């Protein structure tokens, strides 16, 4: 705030001189109030600063408003011709109810960052209090970090990145589900193989058991027949 205060201090004598030439003295008193700080983006087309003033003991005639700019260069007076054309760099609009004056800065650029001071004076009054300046509004125009082309490219890139991340997540979910279903299918196939093998073994054991029983009965029957033949027949004797 040091350099800003210094510029304001250097600017006040020059502004007072201009206001003194505009209005020379009486019993009228003017009070001026301005917003202290205003910050806008470089992408804005225009910005409007307000200047509120009040009067005591002044004639019922419109006062004259003057605007001054104090930047990195020499202080300069703005809109000495009124700046009523909206096509100009600066446009001044006055409203008397309430007592307000507006300065619009068109076609904003970073070079428009400065202190804008509003001065109000009654030209036909001789009192020094009939002219007064505000403390000034510090206008800061922020430069954009990226151009429109770069911002559009970043938006498209972000959209593509979102689509890519979504695709990767979907692929991961599908692979995870397929892997989780794989062991289950293998377990099902293995259980089916085991059950078929068990059934085959049971059938083989049953066939083996039947064959063993048949073969074991056959020698016993042959031995019984031979014994019957060896016994003497009572009828023949």
From Swiss-Prot:
Main location group: membrane
Alphabetical UniProt keywords: Disulfide bond, Immunoglobulin domain, Membrane, Signal, Transmembrane, Transmembrane helix
Tissue-specific expression: Ubiquitous with higher expression in immune tissue.
Cytoplasmic side: 174-237
Residues making up the signal peptide according to the UniProt record: 1-27
Location within or outside the cell: Membrane
Residue intervals on the Extracellular side: 28-152
Sequence intervals crossing the membrane: 153-173
Other facts noted in the record for this chain: This gene is coded entirely within the intron of Mettl9 which is transcribed in the opposite strand of the DNA.
Protein name: Immunoglobulin superfamily member 6
The species this protein was found in: Mus musculus (Mouse)
């Amino acid at each position: 705030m040091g350099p800003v205060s210094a510029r304001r201090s250097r600017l006040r004598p020059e502004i007072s001189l201009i206001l003194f030439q505009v209005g020379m003295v009486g019993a009228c008193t003017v009070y001026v109030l301005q917003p202290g700080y205003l910050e806008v983006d470089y992408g804005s087309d225009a910005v409007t600063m307000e200047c509120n003033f009040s009067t005591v003991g002044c004639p019922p005639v419109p006062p004259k408003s003057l605007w001054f700019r104090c930047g990195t260069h020499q202080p300069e007076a703005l809109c000495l011709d009124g700046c009523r054309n909206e096509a100009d760099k600066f446009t001044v609009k006055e409203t008397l109810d309430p007592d307000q004056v507006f300065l619009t800065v068109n076609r904003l650029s970073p070079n428009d960052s400065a202190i804008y001071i509003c001065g109000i004076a009654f030209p036909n009054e001789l009192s020094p209090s009939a002219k007064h300046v505000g403390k000034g509004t510090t206008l800061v125009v922020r430069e954009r970090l990226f151009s429109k082309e770069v911002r559009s490219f970043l938006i498209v890139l972000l959209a593509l990145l979102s689509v890519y991340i979504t695709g990767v997540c979907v692929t991961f979910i599908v692979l995870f589900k397929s892997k989780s279903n794989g062991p289950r299918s293998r377990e099902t196939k293995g259980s089916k193989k085991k059950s078929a093998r068990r059934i085959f073994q049971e059938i083989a054991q049953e066939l083996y058991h039947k064959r063993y029983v048949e073969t074991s009965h056959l020698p016993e029957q042959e031995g019984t027949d031979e014994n019957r033949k060896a016994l003497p027949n009572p009828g023949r004797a």
